[in-house]
């Protein structure tokens, strides 16, 4: 649902929304999103390595299996590009990420670093921010 509640700068999306993930990612739930519609556009999953271009990615999902060091490398590579970066690794916001997916054993929830989102010139809907467990704005 992050794709539905994110606004990208003009000219950064084409006729589809591209959700990128690292090639080593085994988070199979992402495959179920492929072909779904978000913001009236089909969603395509693209598996990439750090050597691949991220220019057509609107969202980059980094699985916890990447580990903190590798995730820091990805975040450096992305910089302030208008790409929403999401991960399920503990401490993702402290690493410099935008949205951290969390599971406390009973519930799934998420936390947002709004300052990082804004640095990338992205906007998240008020609806999405209201249901976040934590919103950091530094």
Residue ranges and their predicted role:
Residues 2-138:
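Short hydrophobic alpha-helices and adjacent helix-cap/hinge residues
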């Amino acid at each position: 649902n992050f794709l539905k509640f994110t606004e990208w700068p003009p000219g950064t999306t084409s006729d589809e929304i591209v959700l990128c993930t690292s090639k080593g990612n085994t988070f199979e739930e992402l495959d179920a999103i492929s072909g779904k519609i978000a913001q009236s556009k089909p969603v395509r999953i693209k598996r990439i390595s750090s050597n691949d271009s991220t220019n057509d990615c609107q969202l980059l999902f980094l699985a916890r299996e990447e580990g903190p060091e590798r995730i820091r490398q990805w975040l450096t590579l992305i910089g302030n590009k208008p790409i929403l970066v999401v991960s399920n690794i503990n401490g993702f916001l402290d690493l410099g990420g935008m949205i951290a997916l969390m599971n406390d054993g009973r519930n799934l929830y998420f936390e947002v670093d709004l300052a990082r989102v804004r640095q990338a010139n992205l906007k998240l809907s008020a609806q999405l921010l209201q249901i976040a467990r934590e919103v950091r704005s530094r």
